[in-house]
UniProtKB/Swiss-Prot annotation:
Alphabetical keyword list: Cell membrane, Membrane, Repeat, Transmembrane, Transmembrane helix, Transport
One GO CC annotation: plasma membrane
UniProt cross-references to SUPFAM superfamilies, sorted A to Z: Multidrug resistance efflux transporter EmrE (SSF103481)
Gene: yoaV
Membrane spanning stretches: 6-26, 32-52, 68-88, 94-114, 123-143, 147-167, 182-202, 214-234, 242-262, 265-285
Subcellular location: Cell membrane
Domain of life where this protein originates: Bacteria
Name the record gives this protein: Uncharacterized transporter YoaV
Residues of the EamA domain: 13-137, 159-285
Main location (coarse class): membrane
PANTHER family: INNER MEMBRANE TRANSPORTER, S-ADENOSYLMETHIONINE_S-ADENOSYLHOMOCYSTEINE TRANSPORTER
UniProt record similarity statement: Belongs to the EamA transporter family.
InterPro entries with a match to the protein in the record: AA-Vitamin_Transporters, EamA_dom
Keyword Transit peptide: no
Amino acid sequence: MVKVMLGIISVTLIWGYTWVAMKVGIHDIPPLLFSGLRLFIGAVPLFLILFIQRKKLSIQKEHLKSYIIMSLLMGLGYMGILTYGMQFVDSGKTSVLVYTMPIFVTVISHFSLNEKMNVYKTMGLVCGLFGLLFIFGKEMLNIDQSALFGELCVLVAALSWGIANVFSKLQFKHIDIIHMNAWHLMMGAVMLLVFSFIFEAVPSAEWTYQAVWSLLFNGLLSTGFTFVVWFWVLNQIQASKASMALMFVPVLALFFGWLQLHEQITINIILGALLICCGIFMNTFTFSRRKV
């Protein structure tokens, strides 16, 4: 259990700062290109680890479909859509919206993992929805279409991440974690780079020091290292319990965004973040009844 706690803490700290690093990176590099390179950089050291450990690199034929689905969910569905939407949303707010993921996980797990909904989880879902209303409210009232579009993209990415978490627990429980992550990152990278080549003006990328640093941080730490740790944690404890720890990530992201990027933290964002964190807690904490 100590290893699980250390894994959760390391993931939380790294992912808390990831949003600032991403915002810095996509300022100079188109979002799909940034995402594709990030996944590629994250995948390379994982393949090296497999090679050093003399583990089989190829994918078994019967598992190929699962790897492709995982790549679509985490590559295009999560990383691609998230980074594209982040162009229009502050880093801290992006994190708050992405970490509605545990609420999606709880709902999906009810139907696929037999982790049943109860009154507390239902209350948590309601809290999360009200939190989203607080965050979306300003853009909906002011008809800020670009910000609203970006926020909806981030929510779609959160849903895709939630589906991927449950899918990994169903399909990859007995498959080597490093092997699974190496391949779904590499396959996702190829997909994103193809989309970038088709839809983005790649020559517009500016390879500044900040952009290169952001890519390395996001690729090696935020992707390669943390994805392995996170999916390992998911195999050790309930998916919903693991997701509860992630409520601290948006709090750190809001702080880092305010500290480094001078992003504004409004009362709506604070209330929305609190309600979403409350929703995550209600969805994932195990409430026990005392016998009288």
